[in-house]
Each structure stands twice: as structure tokens, then as C-alpha cells.
């Protein structure tokens, strides 16, 4: 079984492609709450995605493992980030994990929601910053997802983006 934690980036700076101070604090706080140790980290090309991963891992008190920038996490694929394209991208990330491995991927809304729909056929409510889905692929290839939601007081909203 492989596991991929796919999250939306934290709160961004309204004037640049980086996290705001609130976003850095949020990513670190969410990272502190994890009990997982990651074998691989994937981020979209956006600076705010890489920063989210860095602050998340800082909160989790983990070193940056093997990592990659994945354009598909920003919707840059042949399908333009369609549900099917995002689902295929998630499967490809799962394939890059070691057997029984755990990965962390940082993407954007609505792309995480599209991936969930492409994998399950079930729509989900829009994600707030640092929320996401936990994707489990069993040895027989069966995929299950679980929503990762934060308490309302933990999130400072910014506008939806890709």
C-alpha cells in the first residue's frame, strides 16, 4: 500500500507568489499535527507550494526527503488539469513512492478537488488553505481517499487559485 497526502498550499501573500506570515505559521502548525514520515515530497512549480512543503516539514520536525517539482500539480498537463488528468497524475506520483511509502504533495484548488473527483467520481466541497486529501492505494490497486479538513479557526482564507 502507498499513501499520498495531497494538500492545497497555505495562505499566500496577496502581492507575490509566496506565503504570507499567516501562511507560514499555518503550514508549520499543520505539519506539527502529522504523525507521518514522508519518503518523497512533490510540489507544483509555484513558490508558495514549495514554501508550504518546507514549513509543513519544519512543523513535523522532518528533513526534506527526496523531492520533485511536478508541473501537473499546477494543472500543466495535456488535459489542462482535468479530473481525469489530475487522477492520472496522482497515480503517477503513487508509482514513484517506494513500496509501502508515504508521499506529501502540495498543489492548488480546484486541482486537488478535481483529482479527488477523477479518482472517485465524487465531488467535494472546495478546500481551504492547507486542507487536502489522503489517498491510499492498496496492493490490489484499489484507491480510497479521505478528506483532510482543518478547524475553522486554523485558516486565514485567500481567494481560490490554481
What do the PLM-derived regions correspond to, one by one?
Residues 88-146:
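Active-site-adjacent alpha-helix immediately C-terminal to a catalytic or transition-state-stabilizing loop
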Residues 1-85, 119-137, 158:
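Active-site-proximal alpha-helix that buttresses catalytic centers in soluble enzyme cores
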Residues 160-162:
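Glycogenin-like
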Residues 146-158:
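Short, solvent-exposed aromatic-acidic interface loops
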